[in-house]
Amino acid sequence: MSKMNAFYAQSGGVTAVINASACGVIETCRRHKDKIGKVFAGQNGIIGALTEDLIDTNKESKSTIAALRHTPSGAFGSCRFKLKSLEDNKREYQRLIEVFKAHNIGYFFYNGGGDSADTCLKISQIGKTLCYPITAVHIPKTV
């Protein structure tokens, strides 16, 4: 089985610690090269996945990623975009799966508040409904 790539994005109002969380996700994924290939960051949250505006964080040096710990604001941009239900907008979910397949994404890390947790739940559910294996993880944006 080939290694799957990861998708990471920031959502909602950015906080003082959101980039530290990004650093943690990216560094942890890099430590597990046997399981995770690249880490793509979505430009402006989930919108980056829908528009296929992905940042290959593997092109960034170890020191650049480490600097995220002390970088204010949201390094990759954020959004307050809420996914509708699968019944209300199946095309949106099909588009996400298309992008995930195109980039071999099997891990979805979404950094934000309550709406972001809801997005992770929906991604997990559509993975099952649309038969695409994906692990969705919500990362809280506050301490």
Predicted regions located by residue number:
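Short glycine-rich or small-residue beta-strand-to-loop segments that form or flank ligand, phosphate
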Residues: N5-T15, A75-R80, G106-G112
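Short acidic, glycine/serine/threonine-rich loops at helix termini
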Residues: I18-S21, L50-I55, E87-D88, D118-S124
